[in-house]
Amino acid sequence: MSLPMLQVALDNQTMDSAYETTRLIAEEVDIIEVGTILCVGEGVRAVRDLKALYPHKIVLADAKIADAGKILSRMCFEANADWVTVICCADINTAKGALDVAKEFNGDVQIELTGYWTWEQAQQWRDAGIGQVVYHRSRDAQAAGVAWGEADITAIKRLSDMGFKVTVTGGLALEDLPLFKGIPIHVFIAGRSIRDAASPVEAARQFKRSIAELWG
């Protein structure tokens, strides 16, 4: 089982704020996510600028595309994104359109599982050639005190068994990682737990050490 990668979510409102994080920890992570908040705040230039600074890193545009899949994904890929996200409630043709464009750029598409989705949809994504999903505990659910539970673990295992590469996100803390031991997680996303730490560098390194210990 390969080691899960570590992704930092830049849900900053400005590039200046995002740079404060990347200057510290870009070299400690595998994937740099231009979060939805930053995508809205700064547009695709955020993707272009971060990829220019860190060409050796995977840069994800968390656009959460809901419609106009080909147009919006092309905007992201032309800004040199490696991956883009499509929201789970989008029509299957939106996901297919985004994937068609991704292939032109040797990129990839992730389905963001935020909110309601079904296993029938999951099979449609697989049948369409989608290989990545993001299992997401929403920001608002976290604020309401919703913790990771057995239902989450069961769903993640089932997605993995279907052949998806699963990314896990949603207020992920270091102490949550053992919950997922034994599952071939593709990526763990940490946002505030790294960005807001007293030492973001050490927080990122602790995540990497824990991942190596649990999956090594």
Swiss-Prot record:
Annotated Gene3D superfamilies: Aldolase class I
Spell out the CDD domains in the cross-references.
Answer: KGPDC_HPS
Q: What is the effect of changing E112A?
A: 0.5% of wild-type activity
Q: What induces it?
A: Induced by L-ascorbate. Repressed by UlaR.
Keywords, comma-separated and alphabetical: Carbohydrate metabolism, Decarboxylase, Lyase, Magnesium, Metal-binding
Q: Where does Mg(2+) bind?
A: E33, D62
- InterPro entries linked to this entry: 3-keto-L-gulonate6Pdecase_UlaD (IPR023942), Aldolase_TIM (IPR013785), HPS/KGPDC (IPR041710), OMPdeCOase_dom (IPR001754), RibuloseP-bd_barrel (IPR011060)
Q: What's the impact of mutating E33K? A: Loss of activity
Keyword S-adenosyl-L-methionine attributed: no
Chaperone listed as a keyword: no
Question: What is the enzyme's main class?
Answer: lyase
Q: What does this protein do?
A: Catalyzes the decarboxylation of 3-keto-L-gulonate-6-P into L-xylulose-5-P. Is involved in the anaerobic L-ascorbate utilization.
Query: Anything further noted?
Result: The reaction mechanism proceeds via the formation of a Mg(2+) ion-stabilized 1,2-cis-enediolate intermediate. Water molecules competitively shuttle protons from the side chains of His-136 and Arg-139 to alternate faces of this intermediate. The active site is located at the interface of the component polypeptides.
Quaternary organization: Homodimer.
> Per the similarity annotation, which family is this?
Belongs to the HPS/KGPDC family. KGPDC subfamily.
This one is known as: 3-keto-L-gulonate-6-phosphate decarboxylase UlaD
Lineage of this protein's species? Bacteria, Pseudomonadati, Pseudomonadota, Gammaproteobacteria, Enterobacterales
